[in-house]
Structure formats: C-alpha cells, structure tokens
A protein has these predicted regions:
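Polysaccharide-binding surfaces and accessory modules of carbohydrate-active proteins
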Residues: 10-13, 17, 21, 31-261, ...
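Short Pro-Gly-centered flexible turn/kink motifs
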Residues: 97-105, 281-300, 718-725
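Conserved, mostly hydrophobic/aromatic
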Residues: 18, 162, 286, 332, ...
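Carbohydrate-binding surface patches
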Residues: 231, 240, 641-684
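Active-site neighborhood of glycoside hydrolase catalytic domains
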Residues: 390-392, 430-586, 598, 603, ...
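Extended acidic/polar, glycine-enriched regions
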Residues: 171, 263-314
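Aromatic-lined carbohydrate-binding/catalytic grooves of carbohydrate-active enzymes
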Residues: 323-460, 473
Length: 728
C-alpha cells in the first residue's frame, strides 16, 4: 500500500517509489508535518515534531499555546489563533470576527482519486493512485476542513487539495484558502521560480532564501506572463543531477500565490493557493468550497529528476485529450503571414503551397469575423465576414480539405470589443465598474463569465461555427488581463468572488467544448500568459510565447520544459527578421528549436525565399521521424545558454534508452577554440550507440562521462541534431 496509518504512533506514511511523506498528530489533535524526503523503508517516528521540547504542547505546558503554535510544523495552518506565520485558511464569522482552529477528527484511505468539482485536477486508476483524506473540524465555527493527499507512486508525485464545508447555521466568509503548506527546517535553501514578461515568459531565477517572505503571484485573472504558479526550494549546489528539490505547482489558471517564509526559528514555510487579494467567498450554511490542486514533487537527484517526474505525471495524469499519445498535425498559421489582411484566395494560396511541402493543417487566425480588419472591433460578433471569406466558412474549409489539408480556426471567446454589436446590445455583460470609465487593453473588455447566460452565449458562438464545417483544431486565445473588477450579476457581498467565478466559468466552457467535440485538437493561447497545468487538463498543448525567435525561445522553452512536457509547448518556425526582436537566424535552427515543442509554421510560405522553402520538406520529414520520441521520451537538460552565454543543449531519450536525440545550438561563436566536448545525458551506460548517418559507435558511459565533441560549427545561431541508436 502507498498509504499507511500507525494508530499507536498517530502517524500517516505516504510512499512513492522513491519518496516518503509523513504526517503526525499531536495529543490535542493538531495535524503536523513530520517528514518529506527519500523513501523510508521502516516505520517513521514522531520525534521530528519536537513535542518533547520547550515550549511543549498545550496539554503539557498548561500555559499559553501561542509559543507552541508559532513553532509547530503545521500541515495546514489557520489564521487568528496564535500561529503568526503565513496561514492557509482565514475564516470570518457572522459577527465579523476572524479566527479558525482545526483539530483532527477522522481519516479515510481509498484507492483511486475523486474529481474536484468544477476544477481541473489530476486523475488515475485505482492501480495508479491512492488517496488519504484527513477530516479536521473547528468546533466553534462548525467548519469541516478536508485535507486531501493523492499518491502517484510511479511518478513520485503527491497532489494536495482542500475543501471546506459550513455545517453551522450561520454564514461564514472564506477570506483566504490556500491548497498546500510545507513546514520544514531550513537547510540553507535557495528559492527557484519562473519570471518574465510578454515575449520572454518563464525565465528561470534562483536566489538565497532570506528571513521574511518571498513570493510569486498574479492578480491579473490569469496565471500571467510575469510570474508562474511554481516554486521550488533547492539545497545549495543543486544542478540537473545533484541536490535536493522540494517543488509545488498549482493546477489553476487565475490569481495565485506561491510564497516561502523563512521564520525566526530558522524554519521554512512554503504555501501555495488562490491569491487572497480580491478574494472572499461566502460560505452559507451547508455550502462547500473546493480549493484547486497543488502538485508536489521531491527529488534527491537534482532538477533533472524533478523535471522528468512532472513530465511523466502531466502526460499520464493531467492531459486528457486523445492527442496526448497521438501524432499531432503539422500546422501552418496565417497570423504572422497576413495579420488581418487576408481573404479566401490568400488562404487557399498558402494551403496549396503548404501541401507541397508536407504541412498537414491550415489554421485561420484572427480577422475572419464581424468587421474585424484590425484589433479595434467585433470581438463577440462571431459571424463569418463573407467579404473576406467568400462563399462562407464551409466553402473555405471544403476547399482546404480538397487540397489535402485539415482546417483549424482562431477564437477569443472570453472577450468583447466596445465596438461590437454584442456590446451595444449587452454592455452589462462586460466586466466593469458602473460609473467609472473602463480600462481597455488591446481595444477590448472582458466578458463576465460569472454570468451563466454569458457562458452560454460565448460557448454557442464557438460551437455553432464548429458544427458548420469540418474543423479539426481550435486556437482559444485570451489577449488581455482582468481589471475594473465589477459584475452587475453578483450582489455587493459577492463581488470578491468574481475572479474565481470567472475562472470557473472559463473551465465550464472548455469542458463543454471537449465533451461535444471529443476529437477536436484544442490549443489554448494567451500569448504565453495562461500557460499552466489547469489549461493542460482541457488542451494537450498551449502556445508557449508570442516571441518565435529561435534564440529567445531557447530560454523560454528551457524554463517551460523545467516542469512541462515538450509535447505541451506550442512552437513554430517563423520568418526572419523575426517580428518581435528583428534577429536573423538560420532556417535550420528555427526548425530544430520548434521541434522541441509541437512543431509548426507561422509564416507566408508563398513569399519564402527558395533556399528556405526547400528546407521545409526536410523539416516535416524530421518531425514525422521524431514526433513519438519527443512526445513520449524523457527530457534531459545538458547545457543552458542562459548560464554560459555560448551554447544550448538538451536530449530526449526513449524510456528504454534505445535511442537518444540530442540538440545542440551554438548561440555565439568563439575565436581560436577547439571543438567543445559536452557530457551528454540520457544514455544507458552499459549500451553502445551508433550515431545515425555515420559509422561511429560510442559507449553510453563514455558519452556521459568523457563527453561528445561538438565539432565543425561555424558562425552564430547554428544548430545540429544528433540521433544515437543503441546497437547489439
């Protein structure tokens, strides 16, 4: 069994293949964190809770309990009763007083895992996952708090979530509810997180853990370009293969916080959940509230082991799409080719040329509906513009299908333009504060998805289009953050529920979409902003960044691949000079970098120089050859140009280590230097490998210890693939 309970010791032990998590109970019923680390083969003990040391437990010291609470490693700390570190749960009662104290009541252990109502969450069979639910109660508030732990043994993952229920007769206010907490002794930890901006998302940053609080967060209504719902604590010197890592990743697409607090007694508290700013939930008598899920990973073998745990877990237990283990079509998107300036003839020209070179799908991006000839109108008016799309959408789709390509289409269902028929008819459907001039971003407002009729309208607009033609792919976009938080639908006491209700509404729409169109390939897109595990639950891939420059993408994709499988990262070959940074890179390098993702094209193939055009059939053949390895294989980070400023290298190995694909990018050339010798990863040290295209044979242990020579590189931004295949 993955989960054990020792009644005499009052201990829960949660085991994966390589890790153990231990929870203990104090005599009073406080739920404490005992241990998280390498697998324990015997019974654990309670002594790490330090209950036999001053200030002792409240039942022993017979005095005030605050000194105990402020030191005790709480499994789920509550606010207002004497623990002055960051709390996870703040409850205000009907009299306006804030305070909550929970005590152990009961537990349940069962095989499998229950879904989280209205939320994305991991899943697994009874053979793959086991769950512990610890029920706690606050007898004063008549509040039930259920702490849920699901153990995915093979992937070395533990997921956590919390739900609360008001069993009293008076309404309560949930002013803060985080999903997970980890209390530990400090071991000179450093904090690792992902930061960025539009066009440079998910850059890795790492620094010393200072006394006080350090955090990442979003208050924008999305997981955001700027910070990411992921935090890891690492021991000094941690690299890809060595060091301890404690990581949390939030399965949610709205406001979040991930915080680490180094406390006065040199302990560390790491918490993660919904950002409490502009959040308050009315919990009426009998009501429940379900908090989203956190995915926790511990690695004793550096960041690489953590990465591969997350990759395997998300592929097996988060992505539901039939495309998860299926070849995805090579698409060409017309956005950077045409922007808004296109019509049926132009799209068909692109389709004909794309077909010649092995491309399999045409995606029509923004500008096909309403009066949408630039970005200042028509969002919400999802009616085909037949001045552009002559003969209607079905006519276009049928002609693209006749050419031999599948067809995809772009939507931005959550938005509304001030200049739209929809806004003129229903201005109250936009999120805004009455009497205040609303903030426009990209000439648009955000629809109030807390309103059921708005969800229904937006969904039916999308579904009606999909029912009308043979459409195989949808790009679901979101190009602005939320502001001016006001809903004419919610009453005054529920306005602070709007952020969360918005996210729930978006989830409900996407759930309807994949239920009605189960074979649809859905790609979520927010210019790289709303890239989070919650969206993976609905779509197997997410657009990684609007910056398609191959060199910029190295750092973006390195940070993204730290926790997300390559098959989830939307990546395309685009034109040069690049539309974002103006850089010129070899077409081959652009293809190699895009191959470390979903692979596609974002360009006008009808205008491409011949020397680049002739490379497309080679690239599409490359994708067909390696797509399964990249989608299903194990990822190894070898070199980071972020760190060395010279070169980038990664590998993808099959699970049985029978083949390894290595990608090397020389970012900047260096004068008067010999070939670079790089210690590779991902090989079986006992096997021998032939380098494809040569007669060269290498042992796995030599490649990983002595290294492989990267030779015959000339110039900046050049790259090469090396495919190693095991030989008998």
């Amino acid at each position: 069994m993955a989960i054990l309970y020792y009644d005499e010791k009052k201990l829960f032990q949660l085991n994966t293949e390589n890790t153990t998590y231990v929870i203990g109970l104090s005599p009073e019923g406080y739920v404490g964190h005992v241990y998280y680390g390498p697998l324990l083969h015997g019974e654990p003990d309670l002594y790490p809770l330090r209950m036999d040391e001053p200030p002792f437990t409240p039942s022993v010291n017979k005095r005030e309990k605050s000194s105990f609470l402020d030191r005790f490693p709480m499994e789920y700390p509550t606010g207002g009763v004497g623990d002055y570190r960051e709390s996870c749960l703040n409850i205000r009662n009907a009299q306006g007083r804030m305070g909550c104290e929970i005590f152990f009541d009961s537990y349940e252990i069962f095989k499998g895992k229950r879904p989280l109502t209205g939320l994305p969450a991991s899943f697994g069979t009874e053979d793959e996952v086991e769950t512990l639910e610890i029920t706690c109660k606050d007898p004063v508030l008549d509040l039930v708090v259920v702490l849920s732990y699901s153990v995915f043994t093979k992937e070395n993952v533990i997921t956590r979530s919390v739900r609360v229920k008001n069993e009293g007769s008076e309404a309560l206010k949930v002013e803060k509810i985080y999903s997970a907490c980890l209390d530990m002794d400090n071991e000179d930890f450093e904090m690792l997180s992902l930061h960025g901006s539009w066009g440079r998302e998910r850059h890795i940053q790492q620094g010393a853990l200072r006394y006080g609080k350090q955090l990442v967060s979003s208050g924008k209504g999305e997981s955001s370009h700027q910070e990411h719902p992921f935090v890891a604590l690492v021991t000094p010197g941690t690299d890809q293969e060595r060091g301890e890592v404690y990581a949390m990743h939030f399965v949610y697409s709205g406001n979040f916080i991930g915080q680490v607090e180094r406390c006065q007694f040199d302990t560390v508290r790491m918490v993660m959940g919904i950002n409490q700013e502009e959040f308050c939930w009315n919990l009426k008598a009998g009501d429940e509230f379900q908090a989203p899920e956190v995915v926790m990973v511990y690695s004793a073998e550096g960041l690489g082991k953590m990465t591969r745990s997350y990759h395997a877990f998300y592929r097996r237990h988060m992505i539901r799409s039939p495309y998860n283990h299926k070849k995805r079509p090579i698409l060409i998107n017309n956005w950077e080719a045409t922007y808004f300036d296109f019509d049926t003839d132009k799209l068909l020209d692109i389709a004909r040329e794309a077909k010649k070179d092995g491309i399999e799908m045409l995606v029509m991006d923004d500008g096909w509906f309403g009066k949408r000839n630039k970005d200042d109108s028509s969002l919400g008016d999802w009616v085909v513009n037949e001045e552009k799309i002559k003969g209607g959408l079905k006519n276009l789709v049928d002609k693209v299908n006749e050419i031999g390509l599948e067809f995809g289409i772009w939507f931005e269902p959550e938005m509304i333009s001030p200049d739209s028929d929809l806004y003129r008819e229903h201005p109250e459907w936009a999120i805004q504060i009455p009497g205040r001039e609303a903030t426009e971003i990209r000439c648009q407002y955000v629809l109030d998805l807390s309103r059921p009729e708005v969800q229904d309208y937006a969904y039916e607009c999308v579904a009606k289009i999909l029912r009308s033609a043979n459409i195989k792919y949808v790009k679901w976009d979101m190009n602005r953050q939320l502001s001016d938080l006001g809903s004419t639908y919610l009453d005054k006491d529920s306005q602070q529920e709007l952020f969360h209700r918005y996210v729930l509404g978006m989830y409900a729409m996407q759930e309807r979409l994949i239920q009605e169109f189960p074979d649809l390939l859905l790609e979520n897109c927010s210019g790289g902003a709303r890239f989070d595990p919650g969206m993976l639950y609905y779509s197997p891939q997410i657009w990684c960044s609007d910056d398609t420059d191959a060199i910029e993408r190295l750092e973006i994709q390195e940070g993204t691949a730290l926790i997300y499988p390559l098959c989830s990262m939307g990546a395309h070959v685009s034109v040069c000079p690049n539309h974002t940074v103006g850089r010129v890179t070899p077409f081959t390098t652009r293809g190699h970098v895009a191959l470390a993702g979903t692979f596609g094209y974002e360009l006008d193939i009808t205008k491409l120089p011949e020397e680049e055009r002739k490379l497309i059939p080679e690239q599409t053949a490359m994708y067909h050859k390696y797509h399964e390895l990249i989608r299903e294989g194990e990822y190894y980070r070898i070199l980071s140009s972020r760190e060395n400023h010279r070169s980038d290298c990664w590998a993808v190995a099959s699970e049985d280590k029978s083949e390894v694909l290595v990608t090397y990018v020389q970012v900047l050339a260096q004068a008067n230097m010999p070939s670079r010798k790089v210690r590779l990863r991902g090989f079986d040290p006992a096997k021998k490998y032939r380098l494809e295209g040569t007669d060269e044979v290498y042992s796995g242990e030599m490649l990983m210890n002595a290294g492989f020579r990267m030779k015959d590189f000339w110039g900046d931004f050049v790259s090469r693939l090396y495919h190693f295949v095991a030989v008998d």
